[in-house]
Amino acid sequence: MPMTTANLNMATAGSSAPLLHEILTKVNNAKDKPAKIAVLKKNDSVPLRQVLKGAFDPNIKWDLPEGTPPYKENDAPAGTEHTTLFQEARRLWHFVEGADQKLSKTKKEMMFIQLLEGLHKDDAALMVAVKDKALNKKYKGLTDAVVKEAFGWNSDYKTS
């Protein structure tokens, strides 16, 4: 599905846009592979693609320790006082190995904790799973093959 103005701009859609964990829960709950692909295509956006690429592309190595960092979950109700992954996805490059050599490892870890603390608790847990390359364990049926087919990605995670 080609990117449209509507789904490209989900980052500016405010609280009307679903949180990424809500989209991936729909993928999890979809009955079969075609239904899972349809959910991803319907919710296609640059931030969703960035997060899923970070989760599945073996060439992306996160420059952060494995496991859940010590952060305080944001308990505010969904849609209030949160930042979203639609807004924050553009900053994820800071946490990729070799991408931001100006930041120390400690600073990257502190920034990642701040990111998690600003997100809805379920999106924060999603980001920890992305970083640990364990998103497919959190969301049943969200596989490398499903993601590649939904976005028309080849084995290098690029459009053919």
Residue locations for each model-derived region?
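N-terminal nucleic-acid-engaging modules of covalent nucleotidyltransferase systems
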Residues: 1-160
